[in-house]
Amino acid sequence: RPPGFTPFRIY
């Protein structure tokens, strides 16, 4: 994951 990425639709 890139830095500052918000885990929103992580399956």
Curated annotation (Swiss-Prot):
Q: Where in the cell is it found?
A: Secreted
Q: Which residues does the record list as Sulfotyrosine (modified residue)?
A: 11
Q: Which domain of life is it from?
A: Eukaryota
The main location class comes to secreted
One annotated GO molecular function is: toxin activity
Positions of modified residues (4-hydroxyproline): 3
| Keywords from the UniProt entry | Amphibian defense peptide, Bradykinin receptor impairing toxin, G-protein coupled receptor impairing toxin, Hydroxylation, Secreted, Sulfation, Toxin
Could you state one GO cellular component term attached to this entry? extracellular region
Q: In which tissues is it expressed?
A: Expressed by the skin glands.
Q: Which GO terms describe its biological process?
A: defense response
What is this protein's function? May produce in vitro relaxation of rat arterial smooth muscle and constriction of intestinal smooth muscle. May target bradykinin receptors (BDKRB).
Could you say which protein family the record assigns here?
A: Belongs to the bradykinin-related peptide family.
Write down what this protein is called: [Thr6]-phyllokinin
Tell me which species this is from.
Physalaemus nattereri (Cuyaba dwarf frog)
